[in-house]
From Swiss-Prot:
SUPFAM superfamilies: S13-like H2TH domain
Role according to the record: Located at the top of the head of the 30S subunit, it contacts several helices of the 16S rRNA. In the 70S ribosome it contacts the 23S rRNA (bridge B1a) and protein L5 of the 50S subunit (bridge B1b), connecting the 2 subunits; these bridges are implicated in subunit movement. Contacts the tRNAs in the A and P-sites.
Gene: rpsM
One GO cellular component term: cytosol
Keywords (A to Z) from UniProt: Ribonucleoprotein, Ribosomal protein, RNA-binding, rRNA-binding, tRNA-binding
Protein name, per record: Small ribosomal subunit protein uS13
Length: 118
């Protein structure tokens, strides 16, 4: 298995799909990485040479991915909570942040129903 950005990339998948295993790289970004490096998208990772994998490593290293990106997201949410702004309060209470209705629905964010005690 090839190791890029601290992640084991699956060998049996095509390059475009395999790169999406890295947090912070989706399909569009992986397509742009393949285009900029000149590696075909439909080639499997196991068929790539070590030089091509090194080229991919260098291309992925230019982006904020994995641990750094997770830390960045966590810090931005924490900053909102510390500010006490509306979005921060919604994060703190575990409710939807982007204006969705909560009278019905929003069960994923709110968690399972709590029975009313009489």
């Amino acid at each position: 298995m090839a190791r890029i950005a601290g992640i084991n990339i699956p060998d049996h998948k095509h390059t475009v799909i395999a790169l999406t295993a890295i947090f912070g790289i989706g399909k569009t970004r992986s397509q742009s990485i393949c285009a900029s490096t000149g590696i075909a998208e439909n080639v499997k990772i196991s068929e790539l040479s070590e030089e091509q994998i090194d080229i991919l490593r260098d291309a992925v290293a230019k982006f904020v991915v994995e641990g750094d990106l997770r830390r960045e997201v966590t810090l931005s949410i924490k900053r909102l909570m510390d500010l006490g702004c509306y979005r921060g309060l919604r994060h703190r209470r575990g409710l939807p942040v982007r204006g969705q209705r909560t009278k019905t629905n929003a069960r994923t964010r709110k968690g399972p129903r709590k029975p009313i005690k009489k």
